[in-house]
Amino acid sequence: MSDDESMVLNFSTDTAGIQRADKVTGGRWKDRRKLQQRLGGREPVKRRAEGGDKERGDKRAKVDTGNAQEKKNIPKPVSKADVNINSQIVSSLFTSNRAKQTSENKNKHNSDDKVVPSNAPLTDDSFEGLGVGSLVVSHLENKMRIQKSTSIQKVVIPQILQNADKTDFFIHAQTGSGKTLAYLLPIFSAILGMGDHIDRKSGCFALIIAPTRELASQIYHVTTMLANCCHYLVPCLLIGGERKKSEKARLRKGCNFIIGTPGRILDHFQNTKVIKEQMQSSLRYVVLDEGDKLMELGFEETINQIMEIVNSMDVITRKYPKLPNRIVHLLCSATKNNEVAKLSKRSLDNYKVISIGGKKDTMMDNTSVPDQLLQKVVIAPPKLRLITLAGVLDGIQKKPLDAGSVAKRTIVFLSCADSVDYHFEVFSGNDGLYKNLVGDSVRVLSKGNKILPSIKDEELPGIICYKLHGSLSQQMRTMTLKHFATDSEQTKGKHLILFCTDVASRGLDLPDVSTVIEFDPPFAVEDHLHRIGRTARAGRSGEALLFLLPGEEEGYLDYIQKYHPKGWDLLDAEKDVLIKAFNDIDVARNDKEIKSTGKTFEWDTNATTWHLNVERRILENEQFKEQATKGYISHVRAYATHISAEKQYFNLKGVHLGHLAKSFGLRDRPKAMGMNSSKDANGNERSKPKKENAKNKMFRMARMAAKQSADEFNY
């Protein structure tokens, strides 16, 4: 190859190597943009005038030089202890409150009318004349101090004794009229009238079903007292919360009366063989007490299963020929509604309605409150609810003890268990000045506890506070109720205040309850009648007070007017309650050590100081704050569960929730209100639960089903 034909290649290389474009990362986007422009050979455009830059000066970069003096200026995280609770904005109790619409009492109580107790024992009717056996009559008069029958007992006892072979019975009467003895006395008379030798092995003669554990326990107590006239008759109590093993042991020993709640009785029917053996040849009476509550609590299916088992038993008349030749069904209720009518059709056969003051062959509702009951109504704005309750309790505290009474008893009904816990703490836990008597559910106030304005420094308050709701253990509920209902040296001369849910509203015969306060409106008018029925029992006088909010709730008065033919007194929250309680006294602040000078202040100043004392207690005590928050949230949720017929009066949209939070001692509305909120009651983020696998879910559902079948409804 010649030189001319050779190929020449010309390569040009850069000795510095190939430069890659720098990538700018980190920092603010404006800083990255300016640096990118400088790397590209461009200067960032200055939009601000030079004069303005000079006036403002260059912004100093934040550089950590380790200087201790500069670090002092760095703000620290605020802890709960550093918060000055008195520097918060506190809303006034007496401003921005909604005015009440009811200016005139359309159903005014006439104090001049002569009152004849409608549920009192009759003066001219003895039990012996009604057909009750002489042994039982003697026991009633000498041991139980019961001399005369009531109106409902006068009608019911002869009917059951004479017509038990022919018909079932629906017993409808006012609360406190003596329905329990009305069906127990003829049953005892029929058993004792046989003349045969009877003992606990003779079989079960009566099955009595009650909706709540407390009512079942009370019926058991009354039955035990009656059975003391003949020691060979033995009752047995079957309720949730007790050990089934112990109940089975009692059933094996034998019993003549079985009293219990639906869930536990059905559980024994399904799992305890001896209970059917006890009833097979002897069962003659089945009683459903408080039928409306049985339906309301969802026991319809349970009752149906029990009735199927009972009705499948063969009645062997040759063993006890003097007893009815059939199983007699009795349904008792103080109210009549569609649900009770439904229960009566399913459980009663060819039944007879026994009612005082109405037609016996109709289901027309003629329910009314006892004539001797004095009903009062107070319309209080949301912010004034707590302070008004304090004023009402203070007014009761200042009243003298009724003649013949050992202690004053007041019941305050609330809508939910959390609200009960909160109000119990408000009125009993002031600075720890109390002593526990029964667990943490019964507290006697100590000297220096001035939770009510009329209590003086140098005197003992003379107050015992109780709390009762379905979340307490069965043993605690039983002991609390027993302590409240029993006259003893601990309760003598004192004011007993029971804060409770509707668990204590049905059937309980609590002695000498002078006042019932419905602080939260009832969920149904039937609950209203049963609540106020805890007072004015068996001919005794009593008072009931209903709290309502201004606005839509005032229409509730027209709704319940037909149940109060004697009318009511309409109270003004400020004039009739607060001024009487807080005028001409000195309510000291709980955050200052100031000795009382004897100087008195205006009533509104004292009321505000009292409420601020509660608020400061909540802010200083994290556990108390949690109770207040839970009480508020549960109250709001419970408020939304009123029955549809009463929604027009109790609509959550018409309630100022911020003002309502004030009545729970909260200066701010809790952040966590929804059931599915991502934050807890204190505003902290909730941790997401781990996803459950199929196997664990199956076992959890099985355990839940087993528990529901074994446990009683926790009401």
Swiss-Prot record:
Motif DEAD box, chain ranges: 289-292
InterPro entries in UniProt: DEAD/DEAH_box_helicase_dom (IPR011545), Helicase_ATP-bd (IPR014001), Helicase_C-like (IPR001650), P-loop_NTPase (IPR027417), SPB4-like_CTE (IPR025313)
UniProt keyword list: ATP-binding, Helicase, Hydrolase, Nucleotide-binding, Nucleus, Ribosome biogenesis, RNA-binding, rRNA processing
PROSITE patterns: HELICASE_ATP_BIND_1, HELICASE_CTER, Q_MOTIF
CDD domains: DEADc_DDX31, SF2_C_DEAD
Biased composition (Basic and acidic residues): 20-29, 40-73, 101-115, 682-695
Domain Helicase ATP-binding: start-end pairs: 160-354
Alphabetized SMART domains for the sequence: DEXDc, DUF4217, HELICc
Enzyme Commission no: 3.6.4.13
GO cellular component, one term: nucleolus
Residues that hold ATP according to the record: 173-180
Record carries keyword Nucleotide-binding: yes
Domain observations: The Q motif is unique to and characteristic of the DEAD box family of RNA helicases and controls ATP binding and hydrolysis.
Other information: Present with 1460 molecules/cell in log phase SD medium.
Functional summary from the UniProt entry: ATP-binding RNA helicase involved in the biogenesis of 60S ribosomal subunits and is required for the normal formation of 25S and 5.8S rRNAs.
Protein known as: ATP-dependent RNA helicase DBP7
Gene responsible for this protein: DBP7
